[in-house]
Amino acid sequence: MKKVIIATLLFTMLHSCMGCSDSQSDMEPIPVPQEEYMASDMVIYEANPRIFAEENAFSAIKAELDRIQSLGTTVLWLMPVNEPGVLKSVNSPYCIKDYKKLNTRYGTKKDLKELVDAAHAKGMKVILDWVANHTSWDNAWVTEHPDWYTQDANGNVVQPQEQPWADVADLNFDNETMQQAMIDAMKYWVTEIGIDGYRCDYAEGVPDAFWKKAIAELRTLDNNLLMLAEGGKTSLMNNGFNLLYGWNFHSKLKDYYAGKCSLTDLYAMNTSELEGMPKGTLRLRYSTNHDQASEASPIECYGGERGAMSAFVLTTMLEGIPLIYSSQEVAYPRSLNFFNYGVIDLKSNEVFAQEMAEIIRAYKAKSSVRGGELEVYTTGDVASFYRAAGSHGMLVMVNTANESVQVKVPMEHAGKTMTDVIAGVDVELPTVMTMEPYQYFIYQQ
């Protein structure tokens, strides 16, 4: 319980990115809407099969399940496992040739079933990436059912018009027969392999009516399926999704670390992203994922390993469900193109991984204050955050700058005796303290 409270605060403090100053006076609380959100200890690990093994990735991931679980993972998300297309291909795993066949480089249906069963035995759920908006150009549907695709005035199948994706053909969701074939394929992996849900790629590109129909039918097979929408619009949640991307918060987080916005701006984005979310639904929060890592690693985005850790703390502890992207746990220093195969040693930085696991343990321990009153502070480069519920409270202070700073402890907490969760000792909080670069304190009462 104690670890929970402190961890949460710590993460919030980490919001403040390095180098950005805030115009608000020190210690002025920023209003945060007091709404109840679903309490959840969910932690999602996004596994890119192409960095686990050049061949037989399902077996390679299975061999890593203990390590993945040790990070605190409760949900294993496998990036697309389907057979990829070749015609006009750029080697993207999101270019699907056959929805009911697997990428043979990853393994067999038996291998996938063994991976899912092994994850279940360890108490983890498994969700698959699902690409509903488009297929590869050599998908059999293109020649057998051209009316299942969007066509131009001359009857030619076209790529998605709103995206520069020339390697894929745009599906026509006005065609009810195509919709049912898609739903049938989604049901296939639930019934044949026993998966626990889907992460739905480019969910905003697919009509709401399809998602409502598909999710309703899928839940006749398993009412507890987890459905994650890659999209930012709150309206997606009305279709049956449980989780929605925190895109805007992530963009603001990167801007903050780049010195392009203030801490106040970041707090405001956190608030605005949560407005209008239906009860029982949450945002997925992340400091990186496969798209972001293909552009720049967290090490490059947030000012080194310590900066990257602070960004992870922030996204994990403020609000929502945390995501870990495979390679993030070893502080991989360079961009990582998910179109390519290339094995990464995911045990190469165990100290960093262990710290991430500690943060996740703190996240899971925060149940005593989850849903409690949140107060955030602007204190220069130090993010400060306090959450209280009943007799429990958590204060986190995080120096997000790569330099030592002197910072005032929030006035209402100065002089209190609280437990330093990391050190395991009781301390009387001073009025002013010195914090080393990226240093953080987590206090519990």
Where are the regions that the model predicts?
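Bacterial Sec-dependent N-terminal signal peptides
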Residues: 14-37
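Short, solvent-exposed turn/loop segments enriched in Gly/Ser/Thr/Pro and often Arg
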Residues: 77-89, 129-138, 201-207, 230-234, ...
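Active-site-proximal helices and loops of the catalytic beta/alpha 8
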Residues: 28, 32, 191, 201-286, ...
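Asparagine-centered strand-capping/turn motif at beta-strand->loop junctions
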Residues: 397-401
